[in-house]
Amino acid sequence: MNILLILAIFWPALAGLVIFLTPGCKENKQLRGRAVNAALAVELALTLAMCMGQGTKMVLLNMTQTLRIEMNVDMTGCIFAVLMSTMWLLSSVFAREYMGHDGNERLYQVFFMCVLSALIGQCYAGSMVTLYVFYELMTLLSVPMVVHERTPQAVAAGIKYLVYSIFGAMLGLLGIFFFSNYLGTVTFVPGGVETAASAPSGATDATAAIAP
């Protein structure tokens, strides 16, 4: 299941890059559109297969004893992963006519696919650090989609989007370090809310401030 988990996360980005670089897909819009739809259909199948792998855990990177990029497949994550894959597939099908006149369709499609990889990574995140990393990847990868039309208005919107995102990222990073210090871990576990409630009052206050 570990290999399947890695595929489910990184397949869209890998497929998008391959389609973008394949000579036959550069000039043939119809072939490229079919390839993107096929890749997204495979991604949907992968996320559906991961529904049978609930409980799968994997550490991708150890930064410290408490801060690490780890994945944890649970029912909630599986539901959102299947939902995201379905939405992306349907969006790709309906976007063919909408984007058909666009001269930069290839560039849009590769970032479209890469953003899905970041979203799937969030769905299977096993800690606040993992969620943060994949969320910031999604933010950076979606900037080219915001400025896609390359008009002054689109560029201004992209800059504003990036500034807001960076500011939010700084606050999120501070929150992660705070919780890591008070709780000793930022790993998602059952009963996490009760754990936060039993922590020192400072951590409880921060939970109330950061929680949506």
Give short role names for the model-derived ranges.
Residues 1-7, 14-110, 185-206:
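Transmembrane helix-loop-helix hairpins at membrane boundaries of multipass inner-membrane proteins
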Residues 9, 71-72, 85, 115, ...:
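Short conserved micro-motifs on helix faces and helix-strand junctions that flank
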Residues 10-14, 42, 134-141:
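Membrane-embedded alpha-helical segments of multi-pass membrane proteins
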Residues 27-30, 107-212:
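Alpha-helical multi-pass transmembrane bundles of energy-transducing inner-membrane proteins
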